C-alpha cells in the first residue's frame, strides 16, 4: 500500500489529509486524521522503574498484529487486561493527537500489578485487506476475532494467570 499525506492548517486545528492506494493503484483510503504531535511524553523514570514491556504479536490466521505486553517489573500469576479498540484504524496506544489512552492505561495498570496486552488494530495494519476480497469487513473480523486471539496469546504467557483474563473495550471495542 502506498500512502500520501498533506498537513492542512484550518482555523481551529491542523489536520492531515491522507490518501492510500492499494498495489493496483486504486484508492483504498481517503480521510482526515489528527496531525501527529512533534513528540510524545515518555513515561516518567518512576514508571519505567516499575514496569517492563515486551513486543508481542497477536495472530489470527494470516493476520499478524504487532503489539505490546506491559507487565509489572516483578510478579507472577498476574491478571491481564486486553485492550480492544473503538472504530477506525487505531494503533496499539489508541493514539489521538498527542493522547495515547491505551498506553497510559497500560502503564497505570502495570504499576498496580496488572499485565496489559495491546495491539495495533487489524484495519490499521492491513487496511482494506482486512476483509476477504470483494466483501465488507464484519464486526468479528474488525475486532472480535483478534480479541479472541489475544486471549489465546495471554493464556500462553507463563506469568499470566489464565483464570484472570479481562477485556476492556473502548467505543466499538
Give the predicted meaning of each segment:
Residues 136-158:
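Alpha/beta-hydrolase active-site loop
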Residues 32-76:
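N-terminal cap/lid segment of alpha/beta-hydrolase-fold proteins
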Residues 18-40:
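Short beta-strand edge/turn micro-motifs at domain boundaries
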Residues 25, 36-37, 64, 75, ...:
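Solvent-exposed loop/turn segments at secondary-structure junctions
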Residues 159-171:
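Alpha/beta-hydrolase fold nucleophile elbow
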Residues 84-114, 118-142:
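Cap/lid segment of the alpha/beta-hydrolase catalytic domain
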Residues 1-23:
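Exposed beta-strand-loop-beta-strand "reactive/processing" segments of non-cytosolic proteins
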Residues 78-81, 164:
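Alpha/beta-hydrolase fold active-site loops
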Amino acid at each position: 500500500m502506498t500512502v500520501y499525506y498533506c498537513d492542512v492548517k484550518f482555523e481551529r486545528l491542523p489536520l492531515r489529509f491522507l490518501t492510500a492506494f492499494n498495489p493496483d493503484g486504486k484508492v483504498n483510503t481517503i480521510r482526515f486524521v489528527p496531525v501527529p504531535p512533534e513528540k510524545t511524553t515518555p513515561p516518567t523514570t518512576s514508571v519505567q522503574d516499575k514496569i517492563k514491556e515486551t513486543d508481542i504479536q497477536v495472530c489470527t490466521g494470516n493476520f499478524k498484529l504487532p503489539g505490546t505486553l506491559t507487565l509489572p517489573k516483578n510478579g507472577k500469576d498476574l491478571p491481564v487486561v486486553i485492550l480492544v479498540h473503538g472504530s477506525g484504524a487505531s494503533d496499539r496506544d489508541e493514539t489521538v493527537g498527542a493522547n495515547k489512552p491505551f498506553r497510559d492505561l497500560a502503564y497505570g495498570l502495570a504499576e498496580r500489578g496488572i499485565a496489559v496486552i495491546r495491539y495495533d488494530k487489524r484495519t490499521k495494519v492491513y487496511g482494506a485487506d482486512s476483509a476477504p476480497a470483494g466483501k465488507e469487513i464484519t464486526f468479528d473480523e474488525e475486532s472480535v476475532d483478534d480479541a479472541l486471539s489475544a486471549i489465546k496469546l495471554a493464556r500462553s504467557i507463563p506469568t499470566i494467570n489464565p483464570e484472570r483474563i479481562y477485556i476492556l473495550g473502548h467505543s466499538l471495542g
